[in-house]
């Protein structure tokens, strides 16, 4: 059954995901975050190793919400860079250094410092 589910997902859901991904990258404002998860019995990795689920979504101002998840085995910045290739708007993210390749985000560090000082 798992194999059937994978085949159906690749054939029928992947094209939908790709269209949503294209539309997402055209939006002027996005949010991104990543969180850890543990995948049991993943080939080539121990059951205690950390994997990451990356989340990308439109802002609350968007007429239609688009929320996409992407599994990655690591937290390398290249994953966000590859996923958001072609995106040229504002990206709201936490202080993770992997997002700093965006031109807009140097202001993020200043904002975070301001918030820390204010507290």
What are these regions (language model features)?
Residues 1-119:
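Catalytic center-proximal scaffold of phosphoryl-transfer enzymes
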